[in-house]
């Protein structure tokens, strides 16, 4: 996100990273699981039995990270992704989820969410590890990070954070931000931080309008058994749609093959329906940018 509306940065930690929430992480894992052709749906009887068991695990107070409203958003996303004939959860079960999950600890919540991706143990372990990092930051929505995340000592781009297809090791020290104040530092593995980052916020030095942000939404080409980072990138448009963003979307690249057209069109139509007024006098919200290098012509 390029913005003119940027607070005065900390010299040692000038970068701003906006993180996924726990609920958004669940949505990404749902999307990731449903990119697999052989996903097994959990039977309703199993879900009911699990819910009965988890009721005994309620904590005296709600555990930070998710609330009933966010569970409702997950339910809507799940229903959009799963064909009606394969849905094993109705309104009653989702209501029980919304009432129960905010009062469960993180491990129990991971077991509950795993019902939405066929109780695949590897996915559940991966989700739980990422969710633990979110809790380590105090469920902060924003972090302050050092410039070394992007460039080296010679101001040259570094591999890793912006190139998720490259395996990187090491950790980076960041500070959660709350009420414009830096909180206690946390050390997070670089690859994990890249997965949990929803937006990298950069200052726009020059701009026509001071109150306009520009968001670059990456769109990796679909592939069989995609890695998690690709599923996250392809989920981003859904995430912005749920927030009724952006005001205007500009399509700057073509699909790599005709087989991708139907899925891409469905995502764009869904975005238009939820974010645009539909009035004939309204300015267009979906715009195609045509360049000399456009693959469509």
Q: What does each model-found stretch correspond to?
A:
Residues 247-252, 278-296:
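Conserved beta-strand/loop subsegment of P-loop NTPase cores
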Residues 6-9, 205-208, 240-245, 278-282:
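Conserved catalytic network of the ASCE P-loop NTPase/AAA+ motor domain
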Residues 258-282:
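Amphipathic helical hotspot of TIR/SEFIR-family domains
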Residues 67-223:
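Long, low-complexity, polar/charged, intrinsically disordered or flexibly structured peripheral segments
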Residues 1-129, 255:
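P-loop NTPase motor core
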Residues 220-222, 254-260, 293-296:
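Short acidic, S/G/P-rich loop/turn micro-motifs used as interaction or catalytic elements
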Residues 1, 18-22, 209-232:
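Switch II (G3) loop of P-loop NTPases
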Residues 224-256:
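Inter-motif core of Ras-like GTPase G domains
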């Amino acid at each position: 996100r390029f913005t003119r509306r940027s607070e005065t940065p900390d010299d040692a930690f000038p970068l701003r990273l906006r993180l996924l929430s726990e609920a958004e992480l669940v949505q990404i894992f749902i999307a990731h699981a449903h990119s697999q052709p052989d996903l097994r749906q959990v039977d309703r009887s199993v879900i009911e039995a699990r819910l009965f068991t988890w009721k005994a695990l309620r904590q005296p107070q709600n555990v930070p990270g998710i609330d009933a409203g966010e569970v409702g958003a997950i339910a809507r996303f799940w229903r959009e992704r799963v064909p009606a004939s394969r849905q094993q959860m109705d309104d009653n079960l989702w209501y029980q989820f919304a009432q129960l999950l905010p009062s469960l600890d993180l491990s129990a919540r991971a077991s509950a969410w795993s019902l939405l991706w066929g109780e695949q143990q590897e996915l559940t372990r991966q989700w739980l590890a990422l969710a633990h990092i979110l809790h380590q930051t105090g469920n902060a929505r924003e972090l302050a990070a050092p410039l070394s995340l992007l460039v080296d000592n010679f101001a040259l781009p570094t591999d890793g954070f912006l190139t998720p297809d490259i395996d990187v090791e090491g950790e980076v020290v960041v500070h959660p931000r709350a009420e414009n104040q830096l909180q206690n530092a946390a050390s997070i593995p670089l690859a994990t931080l890249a997965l949990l980052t929803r937006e990298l916020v950069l200052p726009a030095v020059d701009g026509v309008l001071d109150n306009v942000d520009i968001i670059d939404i990456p769109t990796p080409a679909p592939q069989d058994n995609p890695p998690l980072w690709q599923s996250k990138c392809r989920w981003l448009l859904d995430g912005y749609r749920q927030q009724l963003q952006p005001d205007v979307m500009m399509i700057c690249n073509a699909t790599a093959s005709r087989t991708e057209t139907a899925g891409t069109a469905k995502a764009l139509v869904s975005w238009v329906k939820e974010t645009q007024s539909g009035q004939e006098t309204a300015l267009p919200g979906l715009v195609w940018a045509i360049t000399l290098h456009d693959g469509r012509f």
